[in-house]
Amino acid sequence: NEADVDALAERFFAEYNLKCKEQKESAPETADDYLDLAEQVTSKKKSVEYLHKALELEPDNLDARLQLILRTAEQPDERRLALQELLDAADKQMEKSGAFKEYAGEFWTAFETRPYMRVRYTYFDVLISCGMMRRAIDEGQRLLELCENDNLGVRYQLMHLYAYMEDEMHALALHKQFDSYEETQMLSLIHI
C-alpha cells in the first residue's frame, strides 16, 4: 500500500542522511583519505595542504608526490626535473620490492605498481611537452616493456613520435606488435 511505501522511503532517506553526516564528520585517517580530499577541493592551496598531510603519513606515496608536483610545478621544465627526481626514487622503490621481476610486462595489472606507472606516464607526457622527442620515445618504449598490453595507450603517442622523427622501422615494428588499424593511419605520414 502507498502508506507503507512512503514510510519505507522516509526511513531510507533518514538513514541515508545520517550516514552522509557521519562520513562528513569522520576525520581522514590514511594517506589515501587525504589524496581523495585533495582531488575533491577546488582550492589549490587546500589541495596542496592535503597532499602534504598525505605525505606526512606516507612519505613514499608516489601518487601524493606526483599530485604535489602537478599542483606546484608550473613550468614544463620544472615539472620534468621534479618528475625525473621522483622517477629515480620510484625506480629504487620498485627495485627494492622486486616489482620489476615479479610484474615484468604486467605493471598496469598489478595494483601495487599503478602509482609507478602513473609517474612514468606523466614523465613521458612532460618530455613531449618539453620537445624532448628522443627521450620521450625511449620513455614510451620503456612503458611498453613494463606493460605489454599497453593499458595506458602509449602506442598511439609513440606512433606519432615515430612519424615525427621519420622512424619508419620502429613505426612498422610498433604496428606489427599491436596489429591494429588505428596505427596504420600514422604510417602514411612517414612517407610524406
Q: Where on the chain are the PLM-derived regions?
A:
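Internal, conserved structured core segments that host functional sites
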Residues: 120-156
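Conserved small/polar residues in nucleotide/adenosyl-binding loops
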Residues: 190-192
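N-terminal alpha-helical interaction modules that lie
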Residues: 1-114, 129-131, 137-145
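Alpha-helical linker/edge segments of TPR/alpha-solenoid repeat scaffolds
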Residues: 75-78, 114-118, 163-173
